[in-house]
Amino acid sequence: MDKEKDHEVEWLEAQKIEISVDLLAAAKQHLLFLETVDRNRWLYDGPALEKAIYRYNACWLPLLVKYSESSSVSEGSLVPPLDCEWIWHCHRLNPVRYNSDCEQFYGRVLDNSGVLSSVDGNCKLKTEDLWKRLYPDEPYELDLDNIDLEDISEKSSALEKCTKYDLVSAVKRQSPFYYQVSRSHVNSDIFLQEAVARYKGFLYLIKMNRERSLKRFCVPTYDVDLIWHTHQLHPVSYCDDMVKLIGKVLEHDDTDSDRGKGKKLDTGFSKTTAQWEETFGTRYWKAGAMHRGKTPVPVTNSPYASDVLVKDPTAKDDFQNLIQFPEVEVVEVLLEIIGVRNLPDGHKGKVSVMFSKTQPDSLFNAERRLTILSEVGEKQVATFQCEPTGELVFKLISCSPSKIPVSREPKNLGFASLSLKEFLFPVITQLSVEKWLELTPSKGSQTDTKPISLRVAVSFTPPVRSPSVLHMVQSRPSCKGSCFFPIIGKSRLAKSSTHIVDETQTEVITLQIRNSADGGILKDDQRQVMGVTDSGETRVLAVYTGSFWSLLDSKWSLKQINASTADNPLFEILGPRVVKIFSGRKLDYEPKHCANLRSDLDFMTLVEFSKQHPYGKTVGLVDMRFGSIEAKENWLLLPGIVSAFILHTVLKKGGSEGFNVTTKDIKEESKQTKLVAATENNVNANSTNVETQTAITAPKKGSGCGGGCSGECGNMVKAANASGCGSSCSGECGDMVKSAANASGCGSGCSGECGNMVKAANASGGGYGARCKAAKASGCGGGCGGGCGGGCGDMVKSVNASGCGGGCNGECGNMVKAA
């Protein structure tokens, strides 16, 4: 108890650190600026970047000097051009170098006081007028059509005051940062408030190290790093605050990028984690603050032309309420079991914790296992997504040692629960908790001793809307070769129906293709997609016009794009918005650490292009193999499911009805661009720059839920170096695959028919295909999807792992062990 009080005292001392900037408000401004820059990616590289650096040195900094020196100039606020503000931003993120450059050329540090950001909609007229007077030959806004690199080089070498700091490299180091902090939860007040408090804790560790003459490289998580960057963007305040705290300007070293095991970043993060937890008694790793992995490959390098005509979004939509779909919220959870106390005297078994939810939901309905830090001496965390409802239940189990090679039933020592609602409703009071939970003894356990307690650490992200997932289920019983439905000819297709169901197996609508062969009023070669609601209402949802499909009474259209390369979109959905359909998993759906679990050829990504998102934003994913669509926004649900239905039908059929591309064509194109990525055996750790080496392990013998099995498993996967889902299955598995050494994913050794495969109604997470109930599901890809919030549900053991990050986020729902 005294130690807990010491931890509390240390934390309170850290919170006394004085910061002369409103970091919460400044962080929101910072995020808005990064978002704006990301919409103008010409600032990241190329001639425009070179010109921006020249303008920064030749125009902006001298203007800033005049503004601070002259009373006539300093009336009102300055608003820098976007390109100059971006270079200034990157220069300030090396505070020691920025200060020395300013002192060398201008005799003092140039501050941002009196300067407003170009992205706030602030009036630029006064600054533009001043700019024109000082630089009549240089327009205020960068002219992208008039850039001469030779001229820039000559002018730059002629500048008397120009930093020698490599600003091109600085920009390239900072460009990927926005991806790490771009998710919506980062901009919430509660997340940023806790980030500011954690930043003070981070500074407190640095102060302690200096006082003890300890040379430690402290590495921040991304929430802390965001606030640290924000502080540095106020150069004078940052300088004064740091000198007051540690006697010097704290350097921000972003030049290290080697995330290899044992390298500076890896060891730095491990030591920072250990020092934080020893000093404050709380966990350093935090949900939503870890490294997300590498920035996804863009789908285009050319910004969207916003002059493309789209249909009036305000026009009356008679189909708006045709389907009813409940909105579901989701939180990301990071869980660690810290310790156990009051175990019975003489207890000799190995203890671990099984965790689940009292109210299993569409995102998390499995039971998973975690080791206990105090018992095994190495860190293991679980990160997963779930609905912010119900309670997390923790069951302490004990496995007794035995010399007999017969598995014994683990002994249940008791259980405890933690309410999610307590922290998230009606208002979010905190995003992390670490506490002792007293266990309720199981039946038959001793009750005359002190109650056993578990110390549990949980952190959450603020709730956000969960993507909606709809599945297409063929009314015919045949399921050979595909869990979706076989396309076996026009006449039979026209008479069959496809039921659209949600995650709870509730039918949303039924779709059917009607063609001229069925008789009636349709003209030759005309096709219609009919929809029947649960109330019995029948509507025409799509009509094939001869060259494209007209959807929802011409409000939307679906047509094929003549793609010149495999990287280009294959189809386009046009309406009030512009959506392009790409083969494979792109952007946010890009596979990270489970690439071999499912082939990219099974998927199509829906990407919206707009003025707000000129390089595209993912809005949905179609699983062509198992017949499902994930929609991130409600407006996509109906046009998306109708389009997915048409695409699957036409592509499987061999290409017709306006589309001359087939699934075979897509596969051939995809091979050219290597759409199937190799499985990465790295768990991206921490924060700014850390990624750790991992080893995915499987048990030598199938032993219930050991090694990453969630749900009810029969024979477990036997694989020396199984990757992907080799050692992990969620749901109810019958005879599981015994795969050979180096088996990749769940597919190896599972050719076509897998015995009793996953009962998909119970699968959770992002394994999109694992939703159809099939006695003989084709392949294994969709059969291993559940677990903790994503494609794989793997358990990952990592020696000396320095964090959780990208390997535990979204796609994989991994468990991570770290020494």
UniProtKB/Swiss-Prot annotation:
The keyword Transferase does not apply. Keywords: Abscisic acid signaling pathway, Stress response. Disruption phenotype: Increased sensitivity to salt and osmotic stress in germination and cotyledon development. Abscisic acid hypersensitivity. GO terms for biological process: abscisic acid-activated signaling pathway; cellular response to osmotic stress; regulation of abscisic acid-activated signaling pathway. One of its GO terms (cellular component) is plasma membrane. The keyword rRNA processing does not apply. Pfam families: C2_GRDP, GRDP-like, GRDP_C. Induction: Up-regulated upon salt, osmotic, glucose or exogenous abscisic acid treatment. It comes from the Eukaryota. Plays a regulatory role in abscisic acid (ABA) signaling and tolerance to abiotic stress during germination. May be involved in the regulation of the ABI transcriptional factors. PANTHER family: ENOLASE (DUF1399), GLYCINE-RICH DOMAIN-CONTAINING PROTEIN 1. This is Glycine-rich domain-containing protein 1. The gene is GRDP1.
